[in-house]
Amino acid sequence: MEKLVINKLPTRTWNRLGVNEALIEWDAENAEKLPEERVNAAADEKKTAHITVRGDSEYAEKTVTLTLAPGAELTVFEDMAASHKLSVKTDVTLGVNAKLRLVQVQSAGEQGLARSAITADCAEGAGLELVQILLGAGDVYSDCLVELRGDDSGFKS
């Protein structure tokens, strides 16, 4: 059993209030590895994709990879539901002037835990728009790290 750090800040601020980060216990060794999903958008292509993830095992993990070639525009709807413990890692790579709108709906049942971890790499002129809807009676966590590597790249949440 390991502890995952959620919302790790580069500088500890307001630490005395205990609001810098959250720790959750995670059993990576015994977690069910759900099939990886990939969505690719070719240069100048415009499309929409839907991804549904259900975590019914005691611990379940999934990786989603989104890759956009230069000039591509993609809208992705990620629907995640956890009856137990679910961790979804979304890796994003945006080429020059590519645009991604990522809409995530996360829900956790009363005994559930849903965790979303997004990493994104944005080239020059690329843009990521993130919309998150966090629902449920259980615990819901979200972590996001976006690298703006080129001029005029952007992130909106």
Where are the regions that the model predicts?
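Short, Gly/Pro- and small/polar-rich lid/capping loops
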Residues: M1-P35
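Conserved beta-strand/loop scaffold segments within soluble protein domains that form the structured core
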Residues: W26, K33-S157
